[in-house]
Amino acid sequence: MNYEQNAREQAEQLRAAGHATILAIESSCDETAAAIVRDGRQVISSVISSQIPLHAMYGGVVPEIASRAHVESVDPVVDETLKKADMRLEDVDAVAVTYGPGLVGALLIGVSAAKALAYAANKPLVPVNHIEGHVSANYVSHPDLEPPFVCLVASGGHSHIVRVDDYGVYTLLGQTMDDAAGEAFDKAARVLGLPYPGGPLLDKLSREGNPHALKLPHVQTPGRYDYSFSGLKTALINTVHKLRQNGQDVPAADIAASFQHAAVELLSDKAMLAAVETGAKTVALAGGVASNSGLRNTMNDKCQKAGIRLVMPPPILCTDNAAMIGSAAFYRLMRGEIAGLDLNACPSLKLV
């Protein structure tokens, strides 16, 4: 029996049993991460190797540097993950990996490592969509959570509102028409002279400012639940440049607070509109921007007023990690969705 026949047979056995312990790998951008997750909810071990110091001097992620760092980190990260769990590779039931979307070079490192591990251990290989991983982080932090629910996914590369109809089944309700929310936050931070990564620093600075100091536009979009952040970003840039050209001080805290307030209101208004109009009883947050304190507080207030349950992962599970990939992989495995050794990176992969 060859590898792929054996993997399919094992996957069917795991599906019938309804249980699986999965080694997951995440390398879509600038974190090399691995985790061991049991039954999609219980994290046995999780390790994240961040590349922030490598990219800080460039003000953003440099794809070539990211790929090289993944090559250096992936084996040690996997080894440490197994060690923390007091397990050997042979003890896991399957290997999972993010295969898109993301930086193609970075994705290829994780995919190659996962294929090698799956083949060496003769285990099924489970391909996972990175965005689905972010959604699934909520299953780890809230073990009682079950579909259906509405999820706002906001990160550096993506801004979606999706209805989670079932495990792995999604309906796209809205999306950004231009910039992603995290991209807009990072650009605003750079304009204010904040170092990389700027989003968390802008969040911190905004707490010292007046959120109503600057009137920023709320751009209308053709889609009822769609987003547009380009006008908001441009208005901020023009305001700062005008102040500097006139020799005036740039009140960084007030500008940060005003930008964050406008962005958070846009994100939360659309998400709540989608939730109310679709009759959702639960709203989830996901993605790196979900760690923003303003968004978390605002969504909490609005959900309480609407009588809707809000779930959101802790910040460590909002940013890229492999625990979320292991969670998503479990439900894919339970549907019999595995990959062969011809699995390739898909940098433009869509969720739906």
Each model region followed by its residue ranges:
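Conserved phosphate-binding catalytic cores of ATP/NTP-utilizing and phosphoryl-transfer enzymes
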Residues: 5-20, 128-150, 328
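N-terminal beta-alpha supersecondary unit
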Residues: 17-91, 97-101, 130, 134, ...
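Short beta-strand scaffold segments in enzyme catalytic cores
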Residues: 32-38, 151-153, 159-163
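Short Gly/Thr/Asp-enriched flexible loops that form oxyanion-binding sites at enzyme active sites
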Residues: 97-123, 140, 293-302
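Conserved phosphate-binding/catalytic loops in two-lobed NTP-binding clefts
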Residues: 127-128, 299-324
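Glycine-rich phosphate-binding loop plus the immediately following alpha-helix
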Residues: 143, 166-208, 233-234, 238-242
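A contiguous, well-structured pocket-lining segment that forms one wall/lid of small-molecule binding clefts
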Residues: 204-283, 293-306, 333-336
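Glycine-rich phosphate-binding/hydrolytic loop that grips phosphoryl groups
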Residues: 313-351
